[in-house]
Amino acid sequence: MPLLKLVFLGTGGAVPKSDRMLPTIYLEDWLGHRVLLDAGEGAQYRLLQIDVSPASLTLVAITHQHEDHTLGLPGLVITNKFLGGKLKVLAPRSMHKILERLGVEVSDSYEEGRFKITCVEVCHTVDACGWLFQWDVGYKLDLSKVAGLPKWALTNLIRGEAVKVGGRLITPEEVADLTHKRFRRLLYTGDTAPCPQMWKTVGEVDVLIHEATFADDVEPQKAHDEGHSTVADAVEAAKTLKADVLILTHISARYPSKERHKALADAVKPPPHIYIPDDFDTLLIKL
């Protein structure tokens, strides 16, 4: 079953609070990939608190160079070196040279089998990547079109491979259930102002993790000039991207609680279904 596990190790932004640390999200998929989205201060300690070894990470995906997103990275690098490994890091190209000097394997994309991560340019005050995850979950077959085919043929068709049965070449597209989505997608924006050009590049996603630094008490233009978004901006992005699930994070330390954000989110009729996690909250999502 295509199932994602998200653990929110840090849901704040810029300045930490006792109950809201800096941006760090742990993602684990049903295929066994373990990805850390940004590495706020104390990232590896927080991983250990959820019984995840820093050495077990597939990679760390950093959105941009600002310290609230990167202060936890040196510790992860050092720990991996001590354990005989080499950390893989995805980052904007402007960060590659300095990361290479740290001795990490750095890139701006990752692909393994049916899983890939790519950088999409977001609208922040520095060079920044949103990270677009895509999983190929295979085809769902229209049973009326595959009746009588052998099991091996069905397996190959689900994987996206054409088969030859009784001299007839059958492609997955011919026998697919067209109501089923083959690709499932998640986008993590990191820090961004509203970014229509990014929305156009991405198209559609199933899950959107979008920053909502501000609620509704800051002039939208002020938020945008600082490279950030409001709750309303994040909701608009989710609707444009046709996301089923919207997760709001990177909450400013100016807010003593998330109640103001929650009130705004509660006023939105699904879709999207909106979640505003606390630190250490776990969310399981069936794709």
UniProtKB/Swiss-Prot annotation:
Catalysed reaction(s) here are:
Endonucleolytic cleavage of RNA, removing extra 3' nucleotides from tRNA precursor, generating 3' termini of tRNAs. A 3'-hydroxy group is left at the tRNA terminus and a 5'-phosphoryl group is left at the trailer molecule
User: Which SUPFAM superfamilies does this UniProt record tie to the protein?
Assistant: Metallo-hydrolase/oxidoreductase
Q: Which Gene3D superfamilies match?
A: Ribonuclease Z/Hydroxyacylglutathione hydrolase-like (3.60.15.10)
Q: Does the keyword Protein transport apply?
A: no
Q: What disulfide bonds does the UniProt entry report for this chain?
A: none
Which InterPro entries does the entry link to?
Metallo-B-lactamas, RibonucZ/Hydroxyglut_hydro, RNase_Z/BN
Keywords of the record, alphabetical order, are: Endonuclease, Hydrolase, Metal-binding, Nuclease, tRNA processing, Zinc
Cofactor note, please? Binds 2 Zn(2+) ions.
Question: What cofactor does its activity depend on?
Answer: Zn(2+)
Task: Identify which residues the record assigns to the active site.
Answer: 68
Q: Where does Zn(2+) 2 bind?
A: 68-69, 191, 250
Which domain of life does this protein belong to?
Answer: Archaea
Molecular-function annotations in GO? 3'-tRNA processing endoribonuclease activity; zinc ion binding
Per the UniProt entry, the Enzyme Commission number(s) are 3.1.26.11
Which residues does the annotation say bind Zn(2+) 1? 64, 66, 124, 191
| Physiological role | Zinc phosphodiesterase, which displays some tRNA 3'-processing endonuclease activity. Probably involved in tRNA maturation, by removing a 3'-trailer from precursor tRNA.
Q: Which PANTHER family match?
A: ZINC PHOSPHODIESTERASE ELAC PROTEIN 1
Subunit and interaction comment: Homodimer.
> What family does the entry list?
Belongs to the RNase Z family.
The protein's name is Ribonuclease Z
Q: Which gene encodes it?
A: rnz
